[in-house]
Amino acid sequence: MSQLVYFSSSSENTQRFIERLGLPAVRIPLNERERIQVDEPYILIVPSYGGGGTAGAVPRPVIRFLNDEHNRALLRGVIASGNRNFGEAYGRAGDVIAQKCGVPWLYSFELMGTQSDIENVRKGVTEFWQRQPQNA
């Protein structure tokens, strides 16, 4: 199975979700000076920011990470977290990334997710990678 790459702000909601998920994952650093480059296909797990619009929905460190053509080329899907208080903007970062990068938006969960979200993502990620061609 390929990896997960995620971003978590200082609130650590996404970090806690990843810890509960128990799958291999690499964190996009908060520090602008730190960069990572992936070397295998991955699914991105990202929180949504902003108060409802498209602008600002994707965290800046995630934009920097995806602006690296190598990292962007290995992206295979996106999972978004959000806050349902933002209505239609819930999980907006997933929609923005899926559209701009041409990958499927696989799932969304609220804040740090429920046990059901953990189980759904764990199962969904496993099944997603099983359906992918070996050289994808």
Curated annotation (Swiss-Prot):
InterPro entries: Flavoprotein-like_sf (IPR029039), RNR_Ib_NrdI_bac (IPR020852), RNR_NrdI (IPR004465). One of its GO terms (molecular function) is FMN binding. It comes from Escherichia coli O127:H6 (strain E2348/69 / EPEC). One of its GO terms (biological process) is protein modification process. Coiled coil: none annotated. Probably involved in ribonucleotide reductase function. Belongs to the NrdI family. This is Protein NrdI. It comes from the Bacteria. The gene is nrdI.
